[in-house]
Amino acid sequence: MKKMKIGLPILGVLPIAAVAFLATAGGLAHAGSAATPLAIVDFNYNDTSGEPADQRALHQARLAAFMEAIRSDLAGSGKFTLIALSCGSDPCSMSDTPSAELLDKARQAGARLLLFGGIHKMSTLIQWAKIQAVDLKTEKMVFDRLLTFRGDTEDAWRHAEAFVAGQMTALGVEK
């Protein structure tokens, strides 16, 4: 089986923002109404805003709430069945687990799609998120979004999560 390279050491590789393209899932068709098995890797977070206050605990809490909400929204949509990934005692993440290993773990767990991403706070008011999903059957990227959101508040994070959940829910996957 060919190895697929998935791109996310985005946090620390800022040029991706310049190269980012907004791929659409236009070529995919949703066949039937069966829920698609989806594994979600915990997103990474990076803050290079240079703000003097240490906001790590606040950001980790907001990221945890974001991850909980996206899992809840996607499972609640009826389009996805969440598949748990096991990476030992720690949650699976792009920073701690090689991408090929994550793909294999997701396949072994029975997932059809693997969703992963990261959020980067680049200034006091601007954050961006790079979020991708791979179809593990076709080995194609079916969701690839780079989005910015203004503010570092609970509302800003909720709006960003709701947008991503809506975009993922609109995704169609061939059976």
Regions found by a protein language model. Name each.
Residues 66-67, 98:
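Residue-level preference for nonpolar/small residues embedded in alpha-helices
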Residues 22-25, 29-34:
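Boundary at the C-terminal end of the N-terminal hydrophobic targeting segment
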Residues 75-116:
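Short, solvent-exposed, polar/charged sequence segments at loop or secondary-structure edges
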Residues 1-8:
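N-terminal secretory signal peptides that target proteins for export/translocation
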Residues 31-48, 68, 73-77, 103-108, ...:
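C-terminal/domain-edge helix-coil "capping" segments
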Residues 52-65:
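Glycine- and acidic-residue-enriched helix-capping/strand-helix junction motifs
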Residues 50-52, 95, 127:
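Short, well-ordered secondary-structure micro-motifs
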Residues 11-25:
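Bacterial N-terminal signal peptides
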